[in-house]
Regions:
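Glycine- and aromatic-enriched membrane alpha-helices
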Residues: 1-432
């Protein structure tokens, strides 16, 4: 079969842009954490890249996008081990590209999604528990939600729309973050100590790469080149720009100083919030939506962290959860078939029922994300424990869990086993 070369090239490129978001996320998070925990987040994300890719190969893609079974609940195992995925034929989801190109794009999306939760569990979760957690979260939360909405499952059959993941990815991850923060508990020095970012330039660089990668994340969901993909990129950019300015303005008013950390968090909130509706909305409405997302997510930050004192280390609950909810519900108001004939109309264009469908999808993601994460972590806590010891938390996960440092002291640096023992001594973990 002859494929559309332009579409195929774009999807391959989009997959590369989404892949870029994985190291970008590590840079963003590591820069905002304290120095003693920088290596730990790189380890979590790099391990997740390999582990979640293999899970996708074994059964993840098949459960998410395989032929429907159990009345729209989950896919079957026809595509397990990538069997029955043709090299020279398309899948039904994208008729103009090779089936394996669709699989690859969805794989990097499935990798980056659970890794968003590294932002909430930072500086206190055991690595062994992290491994089990992201695996269980993918199986019990991400794969079912992906099938329900993108794989032709029961929510899709009820009219729920989500262009690139506002419900499937960000609402579920944001609500999971609240549950994870509650079950894990606050960091030992949360509150009394000022937990300042250790390297803001690295965080800004990571945020800029995330912004770039998001063009592939959102516009790749068009699954083709052309006007829709082009509009989606511009919509994504403008919403992020608007939200970034809102966060900078609000933090400036609140503290008296303009903050670049607020700016990058606001940009990320805008990228998250526009994800669900990016392929259904005009540019002018995208600016309006991005502005609203900025206000809503900043308010969420104040409520969750400062009023309720939920220790969500990097504010996944507000930046992803609140933003994802607002953008997903916005489909019910601003979506237009003039932008995407395959999508829905919102209330502004005569379809008043779409908002109800979006409420349903968001509600299901909230319940599954929060409830599923709560259950997973409670079971894991009983079986394996989920927090590092107080001693390891105090010295940092880099030395305590990995015997490595982000910024080694050259005078004390040793080679091989001696280096490992030296780090153990400095960390206070050596029995010598």
């Amino acid at each position: 079969m002859s494929f559309n070369e332009g579409d195929t090239t774009w999807i391959i490129l989009a997959g590369g842009l989404v892949f870029l978001m994985i190291p970008a996320l590590a840079l963003f998070e590591a820069g905002l954490l304290r120095k003693k925990n920088a290596v730990s987040v790189f380890m979590q994300i790099f391990f997740g890249l390999g582990f979640l890719s293999i899970m996708w190969f074994l059964f993840g893609f098949s459960l998410s996008f395989g032929p429907d079974q159990a009345n729209g609940f989950i896919g079957n195992l026809d595509y397990a081990f990538f069997k029955n995925i043709p090299l020279n034929e398309p899948l039904d989801y994208a008729k103009t590209i090779p089936g394996i190109s669709f699989v690859q794009l969805q794989m990097v999306v499935a990798v980056v999604t659970p890794l968003l939760l590294t932002g909430v569990i930072a500086e206190r979760m055991k690595f062994s528990s992290f491994v089990i957690f992201i695996g269980a979260w993918s199986i019990f939360i991400y794969y079912p939600l992906a099938h329900w909405i993108w794989g032709g499952g029961w929510l899709a059959q009820l009219g729920v729309a989500d262009f690139a993941g506002g419900i499937v990815i960000h609402t579920s991850a944001g609500m999971s973050a609240i549950a994870a923060a509650i079950v894990l508990g606050r960091r030992r020095d949360f509150g009394p100590a000022i937990m300042v970012p250790h390297n803001i330039p690295i965080a800004v660089f990571g945020a800029a790469l995330l912004w770039l990668g998001w063009f592939g994340f959102n516009a790749g969901s068009a699954l083709a080149t052309g006007a829709l993909a082009a509009n989606t990129i511009t919509v994504t950019h403008m919403a992020s720009a608007a939200a970034a300015l809102v966060w900078i303005g609000l933090s400036w008013k609140r503290t008296g100083k303009p903050s670049v950390v607020s700016g990058i968090n606001g940009a990320l909130a805008g990228l998250v919030g526009i994800t669900a509706i990016s392929g259904f909305v005009s540019i002018e409405y995208a600016v309006l939506i991005g502005t609203g997302i900025g206000f809503a997510s900043y308010a969420g930050l104040i409520i969750f962290k400062q009023k309720l004192r939920i220790d969500d280390a990097l504010d996944v609950s507000s930046v992803h959860g609140i933003s994802g909810i607002v953008g997903s519900l916005a489909i019910g108001i601003f979506a237009s078939t003039m932008i995407n004939p395959a999508g829905p109309n919102g209330a502004l264009f005569g379809n008043f029922s779409q908002f109800g469908s979006q409420l349903l999808g968001v509600g299901v993601a909230i319940i599954l994300g929060f409830g599923g994460t709560w259950i997973i972590l409670k079971v894991l806590k009983a079986i394996n424990g989920i927090r590092v010891s107080d001693k390891i938390e105090d010295i940092g996960l880099d030395l305590g869990e990995h015997a490595e440092e982000a910024y080694a002291d050259e005078e004390e640096y040793k080679i091989g086993d001696k280096e490992y023992q030296n780090q153990k001594k400095r960390s206070g973990l050596s029995e010598e």
